[in-house]
Design a protein with these regions (language model features):
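Bacterial N-terminal signal peptides that target proteins for export
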Residues: 1-10
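Hydrophobic h-region of N-terminal signal peptides that target proteins for export
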Residues: 10-20
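Structured extracytoplasmic
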Residues: 20-169, 177-184, 188-253
């Protein structure tokens, strides 16, 4: 009985190892990184005109005990025309809004392009390396690790009217193995001065294929932004829904 269990466990482990592809060779890894860089730098130009909904939830945990309270929920319509964003506020905390005044401090879809620039812009001088294979929302992905020094970074953290700081960053990028498209970036701030009020800042941005008109495009899917000030934790969730061509009816309201 014990022997059969051991053999079964061994066969299962062998099956997992066989299912996991070997790491790409050095030349292939360099090409994966080069192709991901090209995709990142072309991201804005590859976006079509579209309309979608952006939903933002801002949450706080004053004591850092994982007891979150949603401070507000903002539902907006986002229109992208000729690479220019236009927001119309639909509701705030479930109450219909006039649509004219956008609440301050909200993420913009263009920030998804900024995150890619922070890593792949040549001025960032990022150290990028292939890390491992992984799976993400049904895609087999390459996971790349990266690091950008503060002197080359575009990640600026501000607090109130005080002097902002430019932080270094490190993290991971998930790249679709079939298309080379970037599907997720995870960014963590480093080298923040000990005297600065915000001592923790991290971003996770997800991208996905969406059908807009007759074609599929890589567009923002969701983002989570985290920060820490003393015991206070702040978590902003952003989701995108109902992508369509301008002038087309939404599939869900």
């Amino acid at each position: 009985m014990k022997l059969s269990i051991i053999l079964g466990a061994g066969l299962a482990a062998a099956a997992i190892m066989l299912a996991q592809p070997l790491p790409p060779d050095d030349a292939s890894q360099k090409k994966i990184i080069a192709d991901a860089t090209a995709k990142a730098l072309a991201y804005v130009n590859d976006l079509p005109d579209f309309v979608c909904r952006q939903v933002t939830r801002r949450n706080e945990d004053p004591k850092g005990t994982n007891q979150w309270k949603t401070m507000d929920t903002v539902n907006e319509q986002l229109t992208l025309l000729n690479r220019k964003e236009e927001y119309r506020t639909l509701s705030v905390n479930g109450k219909k809004a006039s649509g004219e005044n956008r609440p301050g401090g909200l993420l913009r879809s263009s920030d998804f392009a900024n995150y890619l620039s922070w890593i792949f812009d040549p001025k960032a001088k990022a150290e990028i390396s292939w890390s491992q294979w992984d799976a993400l929302r049904g895609h087999r992905v390459h996971v790349l690790g990266f690091r950008v020094k503060p002197e080359n970074s575009q990640f600026v953290i501000s607090k109130g009217k005080g002097q902002p700081v430019t932080a270094g960053i490190f993290g991971v990028v998930s790249v679709d193995s079939e298309s080379g498209s970037i599907l997720k970036v995870g960014i963590i701030a480093t080298d923040v001065p000990a005297s600065f009020p915000v001592q923790g800042s991290a971003i996770e941005a997800n991208y996905e294929f969406a059908k807009i008109g007759d074609h599929y495009f890589v567009v923002p899917l969701k983002a989570d932004l985290h920060s820490k000030e003393g015991k206070m934790l702040v978590w902003t969730e952003v989701e995108y829904h109902d992508y369509r061509k301008p002038g087309a009816e939404t599939a869900s309201k």
